[in-house]
Regions:
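Short, solvent-exposed coil/turn linker segments
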Residues: 24, 114-117, 172, 218
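Small-residue (G/A/S/T)-rich helix-start motifs and N-terminal tracts that mark the onset
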Residues: 1-73, 77-85, 185-188, 193-225
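Nucleotide and nucleotide-moiety/phosphate-recognizing core
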Residues: 37-134, 140-165
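YjeF_N-associated NAD(P)HX repair module
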Residues: 2-5, 125-225
Length: 225
């Protein structure tokens, strides 16, 4: 039976993985990004245009940046845009941004921008990636984050497939409450365990086709949860 856990339980498991094993945060991010990249490839099959990734400043954004680099390195014809929320990036997200910009070349095959004011939705988008927020969100989005979420909504309404990283942004990962706005994904790649909010309330609708990706956690006894 598929295990479902809360965001706080997931945090405890991640802490234990980092403390008791040789698995690094960097390795977990690369594993997660590879699963996201695979989902994007499948969603954009037969579709021409850019892949647009909207990224938060935390590790969810880092997963998105790493996935875009993987897609670019796999396909010389790949073109994309990454749009970052304002603010300082986490150390892992900054590392992935540096790797992406170094690999992108000049002119860059994946352009990187900051979201300021109105988000200019590009034309001919083949697939969009929601890497704004992870499972810890507990209140409605505001400011640039709200603008970014509304842009993803507009792309979805225009028929662009949206892949969400770990959980759709705007969805409470514990209760399944969808705040307004909330990304409606075609496909959600969540990591290691299904989050309770994806199996409750609005989560059953907005997460789309949910896939649980193994990012390399060892098996733990029940008392870790």
């Amino acid at each position: 039976m598929l295990r479902t856990i809360t965001p706080s339980e997931m945090k405890r498991v991640e802490t234990r993985v980092m403390r008791e094993t040789s698995i690094t945060g960097e390795a977990l991010m690369q594993n997660a990004a590879a699963h996201v990249a695979r989902a994007v490839r499948r969603r954009m099959a037969g579709r021409a245009g850019l892949v647009v990734c909207l990224c938060g400043t935390g590790n969810n954004g880092g997963d998105g940046l790493a996935a875009m680099r993987i897609l670019m390195e796999e396909n010389p014809a790949f073109r994309g845009e990454c749009w970052l929320l304002p603010g300082r990036l986490s150390a892992d997200a900054q590392r992935e941004l540096d790797r992406l910009t170094e690999a992108a070349g000049s002119p860059p095959r994946v352009a990187v921008h900051r979201i300021e004011g109105i988000f200019p939705i590009p034309e001919k988008v083949a697939c969009a990636v929601d890497a704004l927020f992870g499972t810890g969100l507990s209140r409605p989005l505001e400011g640039a984050a709200r603008t970014a979420c509304e842009a993803l909504q507009a792309l979805a309404e225009a028929g662009v497939p949206v892949v969400a990283v770990d959980i759709p942004s705007g969805l409470n990962g514990r209760t399944g409450q969808a705040f307004s706005p909330c990304v409606r994904a075609d496909r959600t790649i969540t990591f290691q365990y299904l989050k309770t909010g994806m199996a409750l309330g609005d989560g059953l609708d907005v997460a789309g086709e949910a896939g649980v990706a193994d990012v390399g956690f060892p098996a733990f006894p029940e008392d870790v949860f």
